[in-house]
Amino acid sequence: MNQSKQSLSNWLLIGGVIALAVLPLIFVRDAEFTGADSQAEKAISEVKPGYEPWFKPLFEPPSGEVESLLFSSQAALGAGIIGYAVGLYKGRSQQQRHKE
C-alpha cells in the first residue's frame, strides 16, 4: 500500500471515530445517556416492583465520579492490552515475512 492511500485510510478512520462520538450528541437531543445497569434496574422495577436483588456488589464506589473513573481506567487498560496484542502479532508477522 503506498503512502497516499495509507494516509487517506488513516484520515477516514479518524473522521469515522469523530463522527461516532459527535453525531449521537447532535442528533439525539435531550437523551439520557445512562449505563446498562441503570436501564436494567429501571426495567426490572417496572416488571416486578418489589424485587430485591439476591447479590450485593463486593465494592460499592463512594460516588458516581469514582465509578466513572474506575470504568474508564478499566477501558483504558483493556484497550492497552488489546493494542499490545495487535502490535505484537503484527510485529511477528512482519518478522516472518522478512525472514522469508
Swiss-Prot record:
<keyword id="KW-0169">Cobalamin biosynthesis</keyword>
<keyword id="KW-1003">Cell membrane</keyword>
<dbReference type="Pfam" id="PF02553">
    <property type="entry name" value="CbiN"/>
</dbReference>
<protein>
    <recommendedName>
        <fullName>Cobalt transport protein CbiN</fullName>
    </recommendedName>
</protein>
<comment type="pathway">
    <text>Cofactor biosynthesis; adenosylcobalamin biosynthesis.</text>
</comment>
<keyword id="KW-0812">Transmembrane</keyword>
<keyword id="KW-0472">Membrane</keyword>
<dbReference type="GO" id="GO:0005886">
    <property type="term" value="C:plasma membrane"/>
</dbReference>
<dbReference type="GO" id="GO:0015087">
    <property type="term" value="F:cobalt ion transmembrane transporter activity"/>
</dbReference>
<keyword id="KW-0406">Ion transport</keyword>
<comment type="subunit">
    <text>Forms an energy-coupling factor (ECF) transporter complex composed of an ATP-binding protein (A component, CbiO), a transmembrane protein (T component, CbiQ) and 2 possible substrate-capture proteins (S components, CbiM and CbiN) of unknown stoichimetry.</text>
</comment>
<dbReference type="InterPro" id="IPR003705">
    <property type="entry name" value="CbiN"/>
</dbReference>
<keyword id="KW-0171">Cobalt transport</keyword>
<feature type="transmembrane region" description="Helical">
    <location>
        <begin position="8"/>
        <end position="28"/>
    </location>
</feature>
<keyword id="KW-1133">Transmembrane helix</keyword>
<dbReference type="GO" id="GO:0009236">
    <property type="term" value="P:cobalamin biosynthetic process"/>
</dbReference>
<keyword id="KW-0813">Transport</keyword>
<feature type="transmembrane region" description="Helical">
    <location>
        <begin position="69"/>
        <end position="89"/>
    </location>
</feature>
<keyword id="KW-0170">Cobalt</keyword>
<keyword id="KW-0997">Cell inner membrane</keyword>
<comment type="function">
    <text>Part of the energy-coupling factor (ECF) transporter complex CbiMNOQ involved in cobalt import.</text>
</comment>
<comment type="similarity">
    <text>Belongs to the CbiN family.</text>
</comment>
